[in-house]
From Swiss-Prot:
The keyword Nucleotide-binding applies. Disulfide bonds: none annotated. Pfam families: EFG_C (PF00679), EFG_III (PF14492), EFG_IV (PF03764), GTP_EFTU (PF00009), GTP_EFTU_D2 (PF03144). NCBIfam families: EF-G (TIGR00484), PRK12740.1-3 (NF009379), PRK12740.1-5 (NF009381), small_GTP (TIGR00231). Belongs to the TRAFAC class translation factor GTPase superfamily. Classic translation factor GTPase family. EF-G/EF-2 subfamily. It is found in: Cytoplasm. Coiled coil: none annotated. Residues 8-282 form the tr-type G domain. It comes from the Bacteria. This is Elongation factor G.
């Protein structure tokens, strides 16, 4: 089957922002104007197409990244609407990994907010080109110019306005297009009566100022244009558009647009900008992957290249298990067998579908650049690579943040026991930031996630989707353990003689602190066969498993590097199990000698309160072991940014309301892990041993 839409006319884009900036409403308007839906759904009415889970429609927030295909001006646009709440950061992360461009939506009143910065950093990590849409221009307090400046200052982006608003708040009437030098007046709030006119005289000076900046930015992308500009020649509309496209795709320019999605103003012009400035799959750098021998290889977005696809999301569905994939090269066909290179297992594609939120359209194949979903994959998880058996390749997986909060769960009745374990397995397959473990001391099932809302929604889903009633304990902090110094030549020796065949395993290791975020790293420097090859893997496995429970308080050990340097074996008595135990013994011994410490999750907390309450808020954050990073006031509103241990933040939502008579708000997101003070460590250790 031949390709129906040329690759250069495909756009894979995401819509991302801080919570409440209007992402889902913007997506709904895009779908309405591109003909996918015939009645506009509203988030506050619980009818948005992309918010299709029950909890999303109830809460008016987007939890999972919904993928939808639509079209605009003979281009196919695949859109992912991502959540803005920090607890669902993995959804944004996995979307960024598979997108070619992003519309970053900002509220014209709130401006650049904490989650806007997080989303921006995620886009930076994957080098995703962006356009900015300053939304809600009809709101009281809307200020396009302030937000434009914040994007430049706080996000350090080369934000170039390609539109200016005509009026704001209740007087927001339309938009000036700085590239075309035309004004668009919206005669009603349905977006159906748009009049193209000359630029209003009172705006001409401002238009001239911003158009000059626009032309300078365009000229800087190309030497020939720069020469033309310096010679005083006018750049044509097409030259400006081509230059802006080049700068946007290179990441050196962020075009800035404005509008009001809710009032249907500016959405069609934004769709034009998606087509004009964001890249096709063939215009982004080829994806890099690893061959089985460890060499790096590039795969271009081309149907004729061998297949390379990344599974970026798993979803339980009444129709079966849906695996969302981005095809980077080649063609993925229904009914074909593919290799899951990450697991080295063959899988069969039984069905392929294109998504229209919770509606789906069966297709025979997905081609290079396509986003779709496959059914029939049993072993594939988020981050796995699917490829041709004859051309194996492993693509870079996703960055999975560590969970920071945990709760114990138990089924309400014995009958729910099996259902609970099935539900937890299914949910953890869908969401890599959701972890499940059984506490070896208490035998309790403990679930961990990115925040209280994250776990609340997962427990809610257990009841709704899996019909499991569960009792949930109080939230617990997900502490970690690590080491502060390196130790050398630590032995682990396991010998057992009890008649018949004995057991013998012996390893010698060096242990040192690893880079933050590396987890457990292992290197073998065995020379001369002191430990045979077949026993190196089991020894590593033993070390890795011992990291699951640290020596101080039983929390997972992270960011350590173990090097196997020596050992010995017995021709008859050595076995894989003996070396696994020896590896575990060496690891425990080494950690005890390497100055182990406990780490706690630190949260970035941003509080906004009326100025009068600023002193109270700062004093309160200090008592919570907070580190104040910045404070500012604007129009009677104080903003305080700090890093605070998660352990001190439970119940803060209630406290801040009572301290500010309900007028304070705050946002909180994970920042990093940090060593706890000695007094706190002693309390944690005593509690873990049952003495507190």
């Amino acid at each position: 089957m031949a390709r129906t839409i040329p690759l250069e006319k495909v756009r894979n884009i995401g819509i991302a922002a801080h919570i409440d900036a209007g992402k889902t409403t913007t997506t709904e308007r895009i779908l309405f104007y591109s003909g996918i839906i015939h009645k506009i759904g509203e988030v506050h009415e619980g009818t948005a197409v992309t918010d299709w889970m029950e909890q999303e429609r109830e809460r008016g927030i987007t939890i999972t990244a919904a993928a939808i295909s639509t079209s605009w001006k003979d281009h196919q646009i695949n859109i992912i609407d991502t959540p803005g709440h920090v607890d669902f950061t993995i959804e944004v992360e996995r979307s960024m990994r598979v997108l070619d461009g992003v519309i970053a939506v900002f509220c014209s009143v709130g401006g650049v907010q904490p989650q806007s910065e997080t989303v921006w950093r995620q886009a930076e990590r994957y080098k995703v080109p962006r356009i900015a849409f300053i939304n809600k221009m009809d709101r009281t307090g809307a200020n396009f110019y302030k937000v434009h400046e914040q994007i430049r200052d706080r996000l350090r982006a080369n934000a170039i306005a390609i539109q200016l608003p005509i009026g704001s708040e209740n007087d927001f009437q339309g938009i000036v297009d700085l590239v075309r030098q035309r004004a668009y007046i919206y005669a009603n709030d349905q977006g159906t009566d748009i009049q193209e006119t000359d630029i209003p005289e009172e705006l001409q000076a401002q238009v001239d100022e911003f158009r000059t900046k626009l032309i300078e930015a365009a000229a800087e992308t190309d030497d020939a244009l720069m020469a033309k500009y310096f010679e005083g020649e006018e750049l044509t509309e097409q030259e400006i558009r081509t230059a802006l496209r080049k700068g946007t795709i290179a990441g050196t320019i962020v075009p800035v647009l404005c509008g009001s999605a809710f009032k249907n103003k500016g959405v069609q012009l934004m769709l034009d900008a998606v087509v004009d400035y964001l890249p096709a799959p063939s215009e982004v750098p080829p994806i890099q992957g690893l061959l089985p021998n460890g060499d790096t290889i590039e795969r271009r977005a081309d149907d004729n290249e061998p297949l390379a696809a990344l599974a970026f999301k798993i979803m339980a569905d009444p129709y079966g298990r849906l695996t969302f994939v981005r095809v980077y090269s080649g063609v993925l066909k229904k009914g074909s067998y593919v290799l899951n290179a990450s697991k080295n297992k063959k899988e069969r594609i039984s069905r392929l579908v294109l998504m229209k939120a919770d509606d789906r359209q069966d297709v025979d194949e997905l081609r290079a650049g396509d986003l779709g979903a496959a059914l029939g994959l049993k072993d594939t998880l988020t981050g796995d690579t699917l490829c041709d058996d004859g051309s194996p390749v492993i693509l870079e997986s996703l960055f999975i943040p560590e969970p920071v909060i945990s709760v114990a769960v138990e089924p309400k009745t014995k009958n729910d026991m099996d259902k609970l374990s099935k539900a937890l397995q299914s949910l953890s397959e869908e969401d890599p930031t959701f972890r499940v473990r059984v506490d070896p001391e208490t035998n309790q099932t403990v679930i961990a996630g990115m925040g209280e809302l994250h776990l609340e929604i997962l427990v809610d889903r257990m009841l709704r989707e899996f019909k499991v009633e569960a009792n949930v304990g109080a939230p617990q902090v997900a502490y970690r353990e690590t080491i502060r110094k390196a130790v050398n030549k630590v032995e682990g020796k396991f010998i057992r003689q009890s008649g018949g065949k004995g057991q013998y395993g012996h390893v010698v290791i060096n242990l040192e602190p690893g880079e933050p975020g590396t987890g457990f790293e292992f290197v073998s420097k065995i020379a001369g066969g002191t430990v045979p090859k077949e026993y190196v893997g089991p020894a590593e496995q033993g070390m890795k498993e011992s990291c699951e429970s640290g020596v101080l308080a039983g929390y997972p050990l992270i960011d350590v590097k173990a090097t196997l340097i020596d050992g010995s074996y017995h021709d008859v008595d050595s076995s894989e199990m003996a070396f696994k135990i020896a590896g575990s013994m060496a690891m425990k011994e080494a950690v005890l000698k390497a100055s182990p410490v406990i780490l706690e999750p630190m949260m970035k907390v941003e509080v906004e309160v009326p100025e009068d309450y600023m002193g109270n808020v700062i004093g309160d954050l200090n008592t919570r072991r907070g580190q104040i990073e910045s404070q500012s006031t604007e129009k009677g509103l104080a903003k305080v940014t700090s890093k605070v241990p998660l352990a001190s933040m439970f119940g803060y939502a209630t406290d801040i309301r009572s301290k500010t008579q309900g007028r304070g708000t705050f946002t909180m997101e994970f920042s990093h892990y940090e060593e706890v003070p000695r007094s706190v460590a002693e309390t944690i250790i005593a509690k873990s041993k049952g003495n507190a």
